[in-house]
């Protein structure tokens, strides 16, 4: 026999019209206020959050209370995903020290000026700045000389090696730069955040010194062009003879260099905006000069320029002192001597005493620029290294030599070599011409999409400049005479710039263009170096440099600029471009070496945060680039390399040992213990940065009577998460006393260790003996780990048989575990249906890992699938992310924002936004809630007397009715129709359950009398009706699940409370509604998924609802094979920053 109740409810529109809208409004805290520990390390608080930099703190603070009621108690700490994603639209990433950012920081009291979003693309933001920084003074002043000395073959190898070094470095830099957002600091930021403050500080200071000496080199190049090619008469110091020209030139360089440095520093101090305004002008000069060179090469093939050079025998003559390349000239019928005669003879008379070599050899005039079609390339293939003071000679020309040991008069108008040259020296001089590849990363804050622009723009710029350099080497050797190439200052071609003689339409194009380009490069160096020093100083890793972190009110680094100018003056006092170039080569090579090292280390360690969007990198390429940089350092100058490494080492040790303690043990074991102690003490200094966060797992397993693990799949899953490279502690609890159960604990440890070894889980095992299970688990959670090496995540299985346990202690222990992990700010992973999880030998050839991101609680849901997909079991599973849109959410914009967020996180996944519109609470939800509350009352009655049970039932009834009136005054009215056959058999069926059948067309019972509050007949005709049916089948099924300790008398007292829907706690109804609706959506989308991850709601704050909480979770995960409930620890575990 069944007992039927008919319940009629008003339409939803009627109830919604009179409902108080505030009753369903709940505030969501700003996602930036997520509770988390203070983060130390880099002084940038933005990096602790995933990406949020929104100024709209109110948007998205409301949520649909009925659809998401299951998560309502956590909305103050875990915001809805829609409100989190809305921050993407207002995300800005400003470089440190930028003018607008500093003004905004300094004017907090007033109205802040809105900052424009980054607008620069790949071409303007990365490609052109890199071209400007790479092309420089060496191309115009020294490349022709390098080709003449080393020959085409060796010069080609030199350029290829240097360009390969920068290309490999650019690949490594692209991987680092795309591993998150680089707010400011360029290479210093990337290295320091990848290798730590010690390496970052050491290499950052080396890079600063390199940039500063680069400024000195550019200034010296500017003075050389000014005094040698533009205005030679401006020289203050003049040589009395040829031997004193070098010393006079050095003094002129020092004086004019100091003046130019002062002017440039003043311009930078007054306002960097003027430097930026003229940057494109300087870049235009560089590009125009290079185009003029190529135009000249093309023209020389059919119309070579007229630049004759004069040879005495095979010796090259300087054209400064004479005009006619001949010993004698004919004026009418008379033979007269030329000015050249007077330079080699005692007088202009024909019978004068002349130099012996001048007397024995003839004077020959040849073209200095024969052109590309002359076949000159064969003669310039091989090297012609010179020693200092040697005359530049042309191979293949007849020459009558002198006796060995005959001194050469330095006052004769020969072209002399000013320095001893060799291959390694040329490498050191040439290498600065390929530096400047960091220009794109230094401007990352101004780019529209830095993760796309930096790799593309930098690599394209290096490819372009490499092509220009390599082609220039070949074209210079094919078009220009060898003795002209080896003439560093163009003395043989009337003092013209050698590369200018090849240019079209005029050499002045190259001279003026190179002058302005070197001026611009010097200004850029004096602008960038102080900001780099300011970034290092503000990090606070080098205490004595902190004073240089301050500046003017607008953020300009005044003190850093002053120090930069002083160091730059040191380079100018050296006064030789060829001496300064190897110095800055050392510092740049060291910086590039550590960029490659950082990429190689990150790749080999495979830390969870290492997810570069740039995919075309490999640790072997980074290692090759690092080796090449180290080799070039010693090739250029082994003593400069040692000095640079010593400086970096001293800075490293200073930063490392500033307040640190060092201790050495005895032997290998003592060293290991000392290193472990040292590392643990350093970990104790503070919580890890978000970028260094990794899951440190505490895996709670249960052992049977034979001390074997009940669910070994938990350890299989732990092994599959090993990509996190974190700590693993496998813990278990034995009930009893330590004295009696110590042997069993040892056997359990051995059993767990064997299983860990079989599952390839590297970690520790800990078995605790406690008087009860709850205290033992609590002890493991509190005391697991050592010092800073502690767990931050707890992995546990779902209590599968929590309903059937006689003492019902399992689910109570589970809820206490959830509460303790929350209190300890630990993440919690709960595996449901753990027996269905795959073992390590299994492989999924297809399928998906579905993430249901309901609320944001630190990003754990994003990180876990990424780690799992590194394991071969899950490698072929794709990742899908679902999030839920509410009534007021723009689902299209949410999908776009979520896609952008994943792009910044460097995570590849399919994105889908599921719309959950407001809907009526279904009859099935009421049924589930009613059954749940009945079970709850049964559980509570186990320890109550009859009078206590009656009072408890009455208090719950009153509380439920009061809740209905307070929270939902327009709740749909309920009408109860009881048939005549009311003979019930409650005592005989103590565990009867209620089944609801939703029927839109069934008529109400005519024999029932209307209730006092019944609506008129007209309204009742359209009301939906719901039938409650008490069925025996469910009663039998429920009874067969397990024995119940409840007495029949207690059940009779319990059923004295009528199971009316109006008695239901409306909070439970709404929570059940959330669980049912979410479950329907999840099952619909993810029924065939290999694994489903979703947010785990927190336990109720009122402990009276603990048993209901278990039912909510059970309903939420019904009909799903493999489920992992994830609950964050209250801090960010994933970030978009590098």
UniProtKB/Swiss-Prot annotation:
Glycans are attached at residues 314, 333, 351, 362. It is found in: Cell membrane; Cell projection, Dendrite. Inhibited following phosphorylation by OXSR1/OSR1 and STK39/SPAK: phosphorylation takes place downstream of WNK kinases (WNK1, WNK2, WNK3 or WNK4) in response to hyperosmotic stress and subsequent cell shrinkage. Disulfide bonds join 310-325, 345-354. GO terms for molecular function: ammonium channel activity; metal ion binding; potassium:chloride symporter activity. Disruption phenotype: Death at birth due to severe motor deficits including respiratory failure. Residues 1-98, 152-174, 421-429, 514-534, 579-592, 633-1138 are cytoplasmic. It is a multi-pass membrane protein. K(+) binds at residues 113, 410, 446. Belongs to the SLC12A transporter family. K/Cl co-transporter subfamily. This is Solute carrier family 12 member 5.
């Amino acid at each position: 026999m069944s007992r039927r109740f008919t319940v009629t409810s008003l339409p939803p529109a009627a109830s919604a019209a009179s409902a108080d809208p505030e009753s369903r409004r709940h505030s969501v805290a700003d996602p930036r206020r997520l509770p988390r520990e203070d983060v130390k390390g880099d002084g940038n608080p933005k990096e602790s959050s995933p990406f949020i930099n929104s100024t709209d703190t109110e948007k998205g603070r409301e949520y649909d209370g009925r659809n998401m009621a299951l998560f309502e108690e956590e909305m103050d700490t875990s915001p809805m995903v829609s409100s989190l994603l809305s921050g993407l639209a207002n995300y800005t990433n400003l470089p440190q020290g930028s003018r607008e950012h500093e003004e905004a920081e300094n004017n907090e009291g007033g109205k802040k000026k809105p900052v424009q979003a980054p607008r620069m693309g790949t071409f303007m933001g990365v490609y052109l700045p890199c071209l400007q920084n790479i092309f420089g003074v060496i191309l115009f002043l020294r490349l022709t000389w390098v080709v003449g000395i080393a020959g085409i073959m060796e010069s080609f190898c030199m350029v290829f090696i240097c360009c390969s070094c920068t290309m490999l470095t650019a690949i490594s830099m692209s991987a680092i730069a795309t591993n998150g957002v680089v707010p400011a600091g360029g290479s210093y930021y990337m290295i320091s955040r990848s290798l730590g403050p010690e390496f970052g500080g050491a290499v950052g200071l080396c890079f600063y010194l390199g940039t500063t000496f680069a400024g000195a080199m550019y200034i010296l190049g500017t003075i050389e062009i000014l005094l040698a090619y533009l205005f030679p008469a401006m020289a203050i110091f003049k040589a009395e003879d040829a031997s004193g020209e070098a010393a006079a030139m050095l003094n002129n360089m020092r004086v004019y260099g100091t003046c130019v440095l002062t002017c440039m520093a003043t311009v930078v101090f007054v306002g960097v905006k003027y430097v930026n305004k003229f940057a494109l002008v300087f870049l235009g000069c560089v590009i125009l000069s290079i185009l003029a060179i190529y135009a000249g090469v093309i023209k020389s093939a059919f119309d070579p320029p007229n630049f004759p050079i004069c040879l005495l025998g095979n010796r090259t003559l300087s054209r400064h002192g004479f005009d006619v390349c001949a010993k004698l000239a004919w004026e009418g019928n008379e033979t007269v001597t030329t000015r050249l005669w007077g330079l080699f003879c005692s007088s202009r008379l024909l019978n004068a005493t002349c130099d012996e070599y001048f007397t024995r050899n003839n004077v020959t005039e040849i073209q200095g620029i024969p052109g590309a079609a002359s076949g000159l390339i064969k003669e310039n293939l091989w090297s012609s290294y010179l020693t200092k003071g040697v005359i530049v000679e042309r191979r293949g020309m007849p020459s009558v030599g002198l006796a060995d040991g005959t001194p050469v008069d330095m006052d004769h108008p020969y072209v002399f070599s000013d320095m001893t040259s060799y291959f390694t020296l040329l490498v050191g001089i040439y290498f600065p011409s390929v530096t400047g590849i960091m220009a794109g990363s230094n401007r990352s804050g101004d780019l529209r999409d830095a993760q796309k622009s930096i790799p593309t723009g930098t690599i394209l710029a290096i490819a372009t400049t490499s092509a220009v350099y390599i082609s220039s080497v070949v074209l210079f050797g094919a078009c220009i005479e060898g003795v002209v190439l080896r003439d560093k200052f163009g003395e043989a071609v009337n003092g013209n710039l050698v590369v200018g003689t090849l240019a079209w339409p005029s050499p002045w194009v190259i001279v003026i263009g190179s002058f302005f380009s070197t001026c611009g490069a010097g200004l850029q160096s004096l602008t960038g170096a102080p900001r780099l020093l300011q970034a290092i100083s503000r990090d606070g890793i080098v205490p004595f440099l902190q004073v240089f972190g301050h500046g003017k009110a607008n953020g300009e680094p005044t003190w850093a600029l002053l120090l930069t100018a002083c160091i730059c003056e040191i380079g100018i006092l050296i006064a030789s471009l060829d001496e300064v170039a190897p110095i800055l080569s050392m510092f740049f090579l060291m910086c590039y070496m550590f960029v490659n090292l950082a990429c190689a280390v990150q790749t080999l360690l495979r830390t969870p945060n290492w997810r570069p969007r740039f995919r075309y990198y490999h640790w072997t390429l980074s290692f090759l680039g690092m080796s090449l940089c180290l080799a070039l350092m010693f090739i250029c100058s082994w003593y400069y390399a040692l000095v640079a490494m010593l400086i970096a080492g001293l800075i490293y040790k200073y930063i490392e040992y500033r307040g640190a303690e060092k201790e050495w043990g005895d032997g290998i074991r003592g060293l290991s213990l000392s290193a472990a102690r040292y590392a643990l003490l350093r970990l104790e200094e503070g919580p890890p940065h978000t970028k260094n966060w990794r899951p440190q797992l505490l895996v709670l397993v249960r052992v049977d009577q034979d001390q074997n693990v009940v669910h070994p799949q938990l350890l299989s899953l732990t092994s599959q998460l090993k990509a996190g490279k974190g700590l693993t502690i496998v813990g278990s609890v034995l009930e009893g006393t330590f004295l009696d159960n110590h042997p069993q604990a040892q056997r359990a440890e051995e059993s767990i260790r064997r299983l860990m070894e079989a599952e390839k889980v590297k970690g520790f095992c800990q078995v605790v003996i406690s008087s009860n299970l709850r205290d033992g688990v609590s002890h493991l959670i509190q005391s697991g780990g050592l010092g800073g090496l502690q767990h931050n995540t707890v992995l546990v299985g779902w209590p599968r048989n929590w309903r059937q346990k006689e003492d019902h202690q399992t689910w109570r222990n589970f809820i206490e575990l959830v509460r303790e992990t929350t209190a300890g700010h630990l993440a919690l992973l709960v595996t449901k249906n753990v027996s269905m999880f795959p073992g390590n030998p299994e492989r999924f050839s297809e399928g998906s890992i579905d993430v249901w991101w309901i609320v944001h609680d630190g990003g754990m849901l994003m990180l876990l699938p990424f780690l799992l997909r590194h394991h071969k079991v899950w490698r072929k599973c794709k990742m899908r992310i679902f999030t839920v849109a509410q009534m007021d959410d723009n689902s299209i914009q949410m999908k776009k924002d979520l896609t952008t967020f994943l792009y910044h996180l460097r995570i590849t996944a399919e994105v889908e936004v599921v719309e959950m519109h407001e809907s009526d609470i279904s009859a099935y939800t009421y049924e589930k809630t009613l059954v749940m509350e009945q079970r709850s009352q049964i559980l509570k009655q186990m320890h109550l007397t009859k009078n206590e049970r009656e009072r408890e039932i009455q208090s719950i009834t009153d509380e439920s009715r009061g809740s209905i009136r307070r929270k939902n005054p327009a709740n749909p009215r309920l009408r109860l129709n009881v048939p005549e056959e009311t003979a019930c058999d409650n005592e005989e069926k103590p565990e009867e359950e209620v089944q609801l059948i939703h029927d839109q067309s069934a008529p109400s019972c005519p024999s029932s009398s209307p209730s006092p509050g019944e609506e008129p007949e007209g309204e009742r005709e359209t009301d939906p009706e719901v039938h409650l049916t008490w069925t025996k089948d469910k009663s039998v099924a429920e009874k067969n699940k397990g024995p119940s300790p409840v007495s029949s008398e207690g059940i009779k007292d319990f059923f004295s409370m009528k199971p009316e829907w109006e008695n239901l706690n409306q909070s439970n109804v709404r929570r059940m509604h959330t669980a049912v609706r979410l479950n329907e959506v999840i099952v619909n989308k993810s029924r065939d998924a290999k694994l489903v991850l979703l947010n785990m709601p927190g336990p109720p704050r009122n402990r009276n609802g603990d048993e209901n909480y278990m039912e909510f979770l059970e309903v939420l995960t019904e009909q799903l094979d493999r489920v992992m409930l994830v609950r964050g620890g209250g801090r960010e575990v994933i970030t978009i920053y590098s």
